[in-house]
Amino acid sequence: MRSAQVYRWQIPMDAGVVLRDRRLKTRDGLYVCLREGEREGWGEISPLPGFSQENWEEAQSVLLAWVNNWLAGDCELPQMPSVAFGVSCALAELTDTLPQAANYRAAPLCNGDPDDLILKLADMPGEKVAKVKVGLYEAVRDGMVVNLLLEAIPDLHLRLDANRAWTPLKGQQFAKYVNPDYRHRIAFLEEPCKTRDDSRAFARETGIAIAWDESLREPDFAFVAEEGVRAVVIKPTLTGSLEKVREQVQAAHALGLTAVISSSIESSLGLTQLARIAAWLTPDTIPGLDTLDLMQAQQVRRWPGSPLPLVDADVQEQLL
């Protein structure tokens, strides 16, 4: 006997969360809970404004239609990426095919005063890997901050993300202020320039390795080994089903590329599932999941060690 619930939710964000020049005041999304006999599976559907093709209203319509079909015995996954991901997670939990083991290590997202960051990062236990957003301020300032962090902490490796913010000139301005002796400790820089060709040229000219992120979701993208390309950053909410995520990870690994499972600012429920996916598909790589502190609450499942209050599903708006 099958049954299902769908919930709509909204979480207030901390002030100052900006995505592509848009302030994100709340994170909006949906949960689906599927039950079959004694088994249960949860999934999160939370399109990311400015990044997802769909908004949450469109996702809601597709999700409700899919759930009704599933209740009638049809299991074909929807095509919409955020819905396909959430539904496939719920089905994987239902069938016990998503392993419970999780990688809760996260590359901390660094912002704020560089002196404070140095103290925080110096005290990090184990492998020191952190993420810095660049491209929000002047490229010269970004270069100086990155250089300062690498100089102050000799065993630090940085993942940088420019979100295609730079022209070739801006990229060169950034690199000019990063000591060539430190550049090998930039694990990768995600999508530095507005075009892939400019990003490839940036890698060749600076010796700073790059990673593809947005490119993975473009129709002409193909997995190929290229000089200067070290990694791919996979955001499952923007990608689609678990099977598609797995295919992309396998394609990257086959070329010797690092694959990083990364957050699209999911709630704690989605983040804990991403931590499980990372442990399953990319066990040797620290995932990019340090986004929970951007929110003011956790929902349904706790992220270990988070002090944020937990909100249960039964206080959310139930749609089904």
UniProtKB/Swiss-Prot annotation:
**Example GO molecular function:** O-succinylbenzoate synthase activity
User: Per the UniProt record, which EC number(s) apply here?
Assistant: 4.2.1.113
* Family stated for the protein in its record: Belongs to the mandelate racemase/muconate lactonizing enzyme family. MenC type 1 subfamily.
Active site, per annotation = 133 (proton donor), 235 (proton acceptor)
Pathway field of the UniProt record reads: Quinol/quinone metabolism; 1,4-dihydroxy-2-naphthoate biosynthesis; 1,4-dihydroxy-2-naphthoate from chorismate: step 4/7; Quinol/quinone metabolism; menaquinone biosynthesis
Q: What is the lineage of its organism?
A: Bacteria, Pseudomonadati, Pseudomonadota, Gammaproteobacteria, Enterobacterales
Entry keywords, A to Z: Lyase, Magnesium, Menaquinone biosynthesis, Metal-binding
The UniProt entry, under Pfam families, shows:
MenC_N, MR_MLE_C
Main EC class the enzyme belongs to: lyase
User: What biological processes does GO assign it?
Assistant: menaquinone biosynthetic process
Catalytic activity reads:
(1R,6R)-6-hydroxy-2-succinyl-cyclohexa-2,4-diene-1-carboxylate = 2-succinylbenzoate + H2O
Residues the entry annotates as binding Mg(2+): 161, 190, 213
Give the matching InterPro entries: Enolase-like_C_sf (IPR036849), Enolase-like_N (IPR029017), Enolase_C-like (IPR029065), Mandelate_racemase_C (IPR013342), OSB_synthase_MenC1 (IPR010196), OSBS_N (IPR041338)
Record function comment: Converts 2-succinyl-6-hydroxy-2,4-cyclohexadiene-1-carboxylate (SHCHC) to 2-succinylbenzoate (OSB).
- By what name is this protein known? o-succinylbenzoate synthase
Name the cofactor(s).
Answer: a divalent metal cation
The protein's matches in CDD domains, at most eight in alphabetical order, are given as: OSBS
